[in-house]
Amino acid sequence: MESPLGSDLARLVRIWRALIDHRLKPLELTQTHWVTLHNIHQLPPDQSQIQLAKAIGIEQPSLVRTLDQLEEKGLISRQTCASDRRAKRIKLTEKAEPLISEMEAVINKTRAEILHGISAEELEQLITLIAKLEHNIIELQAKG
């Protein structure tokens, strides 16, 4: 019998994301907000929306919706790039800085709880297998 690996992985991502959403709700944030803010925080300053979308691995229209929400919350600012008026540079606001620490604490605690009972060796094996799957998929996409 064939393993429903794709379905299993999709379900795992869905329930993991739902748990993160639930845990971030007191901060009025979602997993998508966290991923975006985390990447803005990690990347060099004044990244463009295009660079941020690539770093996160999503399409620009999806990112724009999230950035709109974060801007409404006062957590980011977007400025038109002087060298390319079509491009927007993204920066965290002062309001976002303390929130980053709170979010990271929630994420780290949740991750530790999810991985409870999994040895470092098992986790390393899982990471290696996921990397192999990703590599195979990227190669297949390149072939068309």
UniProtKB/Swiss-Prot annotation:
It comes from the Bacteria. InterPro entries: HTH_MarR-typ, MarR/SlyA-like, Tscrpt_reg_MarR-type_CS, Tscrpt_reg_SlyA, WH-like_DNA-bd_sf, WH_DNA-bd_sf. Gene3D superfamilies: Winged helix-like DNA-binding domain superfamily/Winged helix DNA-binding domain (1.10.10.10). Residues 2-135 form the HTH marR-type domain. GO terms for biological process: negative regulation of DNA-templated transcription initiation; positive regulation of DNA-templated transcription; positive regulation of DNA-templated transcription initiation; regulation of DNA-templated transcription; response to stress. The keyword Nucleotidyltransferase does not apply. Residues 49-72 bind DNA. Keywords: Activator, DNA-binding, Repressor, Transcription, Transcription regulation, Virulence. GO terms for molecular function: DNA binding; DNA-binding transcription factor activity. Pfam families: MarR. Transcription regulator that can specifically activate or repress expression of target genes. Activates expression of genes such as molecular chaperones (groL, groS, dnaK, grpE, and cbpA), proteins involved in acid resistance (hdeA, hdeB, and gadA), the starvation lipoprotein slp, virulence protein hlyE/clyA. Represses expression of genes involved in the histidine biosynthetic pathway such as hisA, hisB, hisD, hisF and hisG. Required for the activation of virulence genes. Homodimer. This is Transcriptional regulator SlyA. The gene is slyA.
